[in-house]
């Protein structure tokens, strides 16, 4: 295999690697954005659950009805 063919092959491989790295980086950025959105949603759900538990706690503190 001549030196020119080897260099051409290496350049071709390098180009494919660069494309693959860019595609992986793009996907990583998208996943990071999704994770941030999910963390915000999870925080909102946790706050909402705490609010609801606080409301339920008030009801649970009441005495049971007379038929118990």
From Swiss-Prot:
PANTHER family: PROTEIN SLYX. NCBIfam families: PRK00295.1 (NF001421). It comes from Ectopseudomonas mendocina (strain ymp). Belongs to the SlyX family. It comes from the Bacteria. Signal peptide: none annotated. This is Protein SlyX homolog. Pfam families: SlyX. InterPro entries: SlyX. The gene is slyX.
